[in-house]
């Protein structure tokens, strides 16, 4: 995998060519000061939201105690930086997409941080919703700091223009998402995306799903992407219509799900212990899904549920982060 392959999978590199078969989206350049803010791991203070009205007098003794909790004159007041011009553009884009969006950077979405949101979802309605997810996500940090981590070429890293991608929010059923692997412009493998769960309809409709994805690939994807080797994700809705979700590099940086990269690169044993019919259909991609006999696995995102910020909270090393987090939750509840 080379650096150019990674660049070709940036959202803005492929979206103009596949706009008609994917979810409506808006791409906004990410200002340098916003990037710096997102990479600053010193605090969970989140900007993008007006502070709630403050009372001139405390309503109770408890509130008075809270206000006077720290009178150390050396204690710094933590305030979130504001980006009014960028915030306006983001809110206009969100409104144009129906009021709710799925956010991501050039490559990654903050899927590992869904747990921190009030609704345990990546659904965002404001810039502060987006900032909370981004600042809590290792995936987003990796986009910023290690986009070419698995590339084999030694050329200098290209300059990246980072962008905020806002996708119209759609309620997608995890059991209808599939990852497709393409080698030399040939679809060689299809894997259930949410492989930690068993979905009865996938097992029963396997051949139909495979044919549907093959038809979509031949009509809309094959020979149209910038590389010969790549990975793409699709969603098949209840009517059987296929939607393109994303492109990823063909290599270790991308999760191979129910395949191994050794299998995909060599194309050996792709059908494995699957049906003889599959093995005989040499022109058909291998299709893998979680069988009912397989023990349901924990979500791969569970390991991301305790970021350092919360380890600091549990050990009492950073009380400011707890205050900031509780204030943010209170603001969200008041807005709701």
UniProtKB/Swiss-Prot annotation:
<feature type="binding site">
    <location>
        <position position="169"/>
    </location>
    <ligand>
        <name>ATP</name>
    </ligand>
</feature>
<keyword id="KW-0597">Phosphoprotein</keyword>
<comment type="subunit">
    <text>Interacts with the eIF2 complex gamma subunit EIF2S3 (via C-terminus); the interaction is direct. Interacts with the eIF2 complex alpha subunit EIF2S1. Interacts with the eIF2 complex beta subunit EIF2S2.</text>
</comment>
<feature type="binding site">
    <location>
        <position position="107"/>
    </location>
    <ligand>
        <name>ATP</name>
    </ligand>
</feature>
<dbReference type="GO" id="GO:1905143">
    <property type="term" value="P:eukaryotic translation initiation factor 2 complex assembly"/>
</dbReference>
<feature type="binding site">
    <location>
        <position position="233"/>
    </location>
    <ligand>
        <name>ATP</name>
    </ligand>
</feature>
<feature type="binding site">
    <location>
        <position position="109"/>
    </location>
    <ligand>
        <name>ATP</name>
    </ligand>
</feature>
<protein>
    <recommendedName>
        <fullName>Translation initiation factor eIF2 assembly protein</fullName>
    </recommendedName>
</protein>
<feature type="binding site">
    <location>
        <position position="248"/>
    </location>
    <ligand>
        <name>Mg(2+)</name>
    </ligand>
</feature>
<feature type="binding site">
    <location>
        <position position="179"/>
    </location>
    <ligand>
        <name>ATP</name>
    </ligand>
</feature>
<feature type="modified residue" description="Phosphoserine">
    <location>
        <position position="60"/>
    </location>
</feature>
<keyword id="KW-0479">Metal-binding</keyword>
<dbReference type="GO" id="GO:0005737">
    <property type="term" value="C:cytoplasm"/>
</dbReference>
<dbReference type="InterPro" id="IPR009772">
    <property type="entry name" value="CDC123"/>
</dbReference>
<keyword id="KW-0143">Chaperone</keyword>
<keyword id="KW-0547">Nucleotide-binding</keyword>
<feature type="binding site">
    <location>
        <position position="246"/>
    </location>
    <ligand>
        <name>Mg(2+)</name>
    </ligand>
</feature>
<keyword id="KW-0067">ATP-binding</keyword>
<dbReference type="GO" id="GO:0005524">
    <property type="term" value="F:ATP binding"/>
</dbReference>
<keyword id="KW-0963">Cytoplasm</keyword>
<feature type="binding site">
    <location>
        <position position="177"/>
    </location>
    <ligand>
        <name>ATP</name>
    </ligand>
</feature>
<comment type="similarity">
    <text>Belongs to the CDC123 family.</text>
</comment>
<dbReference type="Pfam" id="PF07065">
    <property type="entry name" value="D123"/>
</dbReference>
<feature type="binding site">
    <location>
        <position position="193"/>
    </location>
    <ligand>
        <name>ATP</name>
    </ligand>
</feature>
<feature type="binding site">
    <location>
        <position position="168"/>
    </location>
    <ligand>
        <name>ATP</name>
    </ligand>
</feature>
<comment type="function">
    <text>ATP-dependent protein-folding chaperone for the eIF2 complex. Binds to the gamma subunit of the eIF2 complex which allows the subunit to assemble with the alpha and beta subunits.</text>
</comment>
<feature type="binding site">
    <location>
        <position position="170"/>
    </location>
    <ligand>
        <name>ATP</name>
    </ligand>
</feature>
<dbReference type="GO" id="GO:0000287">
    <property type="term" value="F:magnesium ion binding"/>
</dbReference>
<feature type="binding site">
    <location>
        <position position="104"/>
    </location>
    <ligand>
        <name>ATP</name>
    </ligand>
</feature>
<feature type="binding site">
    <location>
        <position position="167"/>
    </location>
    <ligand>
        <name>ATP</name>
    </ligand>
</feature>
<dbReference type="GO" id="GO:0044183">
    <property type="term" value="F:protein folding chaperone"/>
</dbReference>
<feature type="binding site">
    <location>
        <position position="248"/>
    </location>
    <ligand>
        <name>ATP</name>
    </ligand>
</feature>
<keyword id="KW-0460">Magnesium</keyword>
<feature type="binding site">
    <location>
        <position position="111"/>
    </location>
    <ligand>
        <name>ATP</name>
    </ligand>
</feature>
<feature type="binding site">
    <location>
        <position position="246"/>
    </location>
    <ligand>
        <name>ATP</name>
    </ligand>
</feature>
């Amino acid at each position: 995998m080379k650096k150019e392959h990674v660049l070709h999978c940036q959202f803005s590199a492929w979206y103009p060519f596949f706009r008609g078969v994917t979810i409506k989206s808006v791409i906004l350049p990410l200002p340098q000061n916003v990037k710096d803010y997102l990479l600053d791991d010193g605090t969970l203070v989140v900007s993008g939201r007006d502070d709630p009205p403050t009372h001139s007098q405390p309503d109770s003794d408890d509130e008075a105690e809270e206000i006077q909790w720290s009178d150390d004159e050396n204690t710094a007041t933590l305030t979130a930086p504001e980006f009014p011009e960028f915030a306006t553009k983001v809110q206009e884009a969100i409104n144009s997409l129906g009021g709710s969006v799925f956010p991501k950077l050039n490559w990654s979405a903050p899927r590992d941080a869904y747990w921190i949101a009030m609704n345990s979802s990546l659904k965002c309605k404001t810039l502060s919703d987006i900032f909370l997810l981004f600042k809590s996500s290792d995936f987003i940090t990796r986009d910023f700091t290690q986009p070419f981590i698995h590339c084999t070429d030694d050329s200098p890293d290209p300059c990246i223009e980072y962008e905020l991608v806002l996708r119209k929010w759609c309620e997608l059923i995890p059991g209808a998402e599939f990852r497709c692997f393409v080698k030399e412009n040939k679809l060689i493998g299809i894997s259930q995306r949410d492989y930690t769960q068993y979905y009865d309809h996938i097992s029963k409709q396997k051949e139909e799903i495979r044919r549907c994805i093959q038809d979509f690939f031949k009509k809309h994807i094959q020979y149209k992407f910038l590389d010969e080797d790549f990975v793409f994700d699709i969603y098949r809705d209840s009517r059987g219509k296929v939607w393109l979700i994303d492109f990823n590099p063909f290599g270790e940086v991308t999760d191979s799900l129910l395949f191994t990269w050794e299998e995909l690169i060599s194309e050996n044993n792709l059908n494995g212990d699957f049906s003889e019919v599959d093995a005989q259909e040499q022109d058909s991609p291998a299709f893998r899904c979680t069988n009912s006999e397989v023990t349901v696995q924990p979500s791969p995102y569970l390991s991301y549920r305790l970021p350092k910020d919360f380890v600091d909270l549990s050990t009492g090393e950073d009380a400011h982060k707890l205050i900031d987090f509780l204030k943010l939750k209170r603001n969200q509840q008041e807005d709701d």
